[in-house]
Amino acid sequence: DDFRNEFDRLLIHMTEEQFAKLEQALAHLSHQVTELEKSKSKELKAQILREISIGLDFIDSAKGHFERELKRADLNLAEKFNFESALSTGAVLHKDLTALATKVKAIETK
């Protein structure tokens, strides 16, 4: 049981670190979109969409795992809160990345 709790704690910690990196990537991608609007580069558009796709895939994977974990009967209040918090953070990031992808796809390239 202690092993499982430690595993959950480490998993949440690692996911929070990845979400923080995704937030930084989102800011960087927003700057790249500004550059894309000026340059109309097909290569830059493809690169931005690839990076967004990787972020969305990570969030979707984490979401599936955390939703399964929340069904466990042995979770204490703190563990449940941590999983729900990670799901909420992931949902916000997913929404922002999806909106950015929509914006990028709408940009005409040369």
UniProtKB/Swiss-Prot annotation:
Gene3D superfamilies: 1.20.58.970. It comes from the Eukaryota. Keywords: Allergen. The keyword Signal does not apply. InterPro entries: Mite_allergen_group-5/21, Mite_allergen_group-5/21_sf. It holds the Pfam family Blo-t-5. Belongs to the mite group 5 allergen family. This is Mite allergen Lep d 5. It comes from Lepidoglyphus destructor (Storage mite).
